[in-house]
Amino acid sequence: MRLKQAPWLLLCDVGPIPGLDDPNHLTSTADGFPSPSAVADASRSVSPTPAEAAQLSSKESQKLRPKTKDPAAHLIYIRYLQRNQPIRTAIEKFGSGYQDYLQAPLQPLTDNLESVTYEVFEKDPVKYDWYERAIAQALSDWSEQRKPTSSPSGAVVIAVAGSGRGPLVTRALRASEMTGVAVEIWAVEKNPNAYVLLQRHNEEDWGRAVNVVKSDMRAWKGPLRATTGPIGQAITTATSAPASPYGKVDILVSELLGSFADNELSPECLDGVQHVLAPQYGISIPSSYTAHLTPVLAPRLHSDISHRAITDTTATETPYVVMLHAIDYLATSVPGHPQVQEVWEFVHPLPSSTLAIAEARRGGGVSGGGGGSMSGGDGANEHNTRSARLKFVCKDRGVVNGLAGYFEAVLYDGGEAGKVELSTRPDTIDAKSKDMISWFPIFFPLKV
């Protein structure tokens, strides 16, 4: 198997250093270094005195004597390698101890995440910078193109759906300050613990500039503007239907992506909140995302999952989030068949016609829909069904223990200004989002 990283050093025919374990045997050493030739490795705190330097100079003028074999030369070279090894990347530092450690994917829609989980995600040095860039670019384009806003004051309305502890809200405020474009921000969060912290941030950090809402994003009706009419006013059949007290959102910001893009129900959540988005000019950040796969040889993961399968029959049918380490990529890149291939794509916002058909199916208004739970579902989510058939070219023989999954996301497409993108693919992460640590790859095991 081709090793992904260099192995440990293997020393052959190396015994104990002569005299090192004998207290009665004196060896010539240089201030604690195991060899006279190691003086070059010493720090400047052990530099020779002027007298010693003069003595060394006089010795150099004498005839050089043949040197004996240094019994500790291998230690000198190991120290040299240790000092000159490349600096670990951000992902290597963050993932230390997590290599090939199987984890179950998060389910933020079902579970309320703990504060420590939010804290880990907020340490990402790249993701939130990229989100801030995307929001700032969107605000600049909005102002330059003179698009109408959904706010009575003329401010661009931004909703952060699933705002957690508020890092995206902070970045949205920074983007507004950087671009000089006024914004009206709504933070929507269902987690009661995170909601309390959002209120605290709003009081202490954001100057009460944010409207904090405790709600599932799919049940949120939009920014509350005004009542339907004066209190006590009767509505008769002759009067027209009252206007909705809820406004629209210009920019919908979310971070619902999983390791395989859609595996944490991002499409379903964004479909459920799209009704608050302005129909003509509203945009979503991210605007699209794609899932990617490649076959891998992973004997360590295969062994771990096989042991789990003894007591858990679903172990081989469960996807795992894991920092892949002891693996080998079996596929090679050839024309038409790259090593890592795109599986499917989701785009937001969806066309209004697609959502209308989904709602009709939910209510049974379309032939074939409305079957209900007794028929296995009502078909309202059929537009999010995806399937793919991929062909990989493997040059060398090997056992495919599973499929490694990645994703790419376009946060904002600024046209000529370029795209703001995220990627976890090993061949594009450095170009699109170097040192991003928020997502490990996902591993789909195969029964062999």
Provide a role label for each language-model segment:
Residues 1-115, 122-123, 127, 133, ...:
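Class I SAM-binding transferase module
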Residues 165-181:
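Conserved SAM-binding loop of SAM-dependent methyltransferases across substrates and taxa
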